[in-house]
């Protein structure tokens, strides 16, 4: 959540696959807080990244452990668009069947 507060514009948006985007830094922080509250452990690893001007693509590996003990592993690509030193748009691409609870 600190990363969202520090590195995202006030009007930033995040979008999961083809779902409607969430808009506004406060909304993004609240969503992240709720998602993390369902987990007992979150492990992420940056596999690779590419930067072209104000656009960044990051390939992530995630391992999420729910409070029930169920573990979910998945790959994700985050596509970021930056405005200066902050992200104003981010979209995530992943197989939703890997993380649906």
Show the residue positions of the predicted features:
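Short, surface-exposed coil-to-beta transition loops
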Residues: 43-45, 59, 72-78
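Hydrophobic beta-strand positions in extracellular immunoglobulin-like domains
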Residues: 62-64, 82
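A solvent-exposed, acidic/Ser-Thr-rich amphipathic alpha-helical stretch
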Residues: 1-53
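Short beta-strand edge/turn micro-motifs at domain boundaries
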Residues: 75-101
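Short, cysteine-centered beta-strand-loop-beta hairpins and adjacent loop/turn segments enriched
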Residues: 38, 64-73
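A short, polar/proline- and glycine-enriched secondary-structure boundary/capping micro-motif
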Residues: 26, 68-71, 99-101
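A short hydrophobic beta-strand element
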Residues: 51-62
């Amino acid at each position: 959540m600190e990363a969202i507060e520090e590195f995202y514009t006030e009007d930033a948006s995040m979008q999961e696959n083809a779902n409607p985007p969430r808009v506004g830094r406060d909304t993004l922080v609240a969503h992240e807080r709720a998602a993390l509250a369902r987990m007992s452990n979150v492990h992420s690893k940056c596999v690779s990244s590419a930067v072209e001007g104000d656009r960044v693509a990051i390939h992530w590996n995630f391992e999420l452990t729910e409070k029930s003990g169920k573990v979910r592993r998945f790959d994700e690509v985050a596509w970021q668009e930056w405005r200066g030193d902050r992200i104003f748009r981010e979209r995530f691409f992943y197989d939703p069947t890997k993380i649906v609870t």
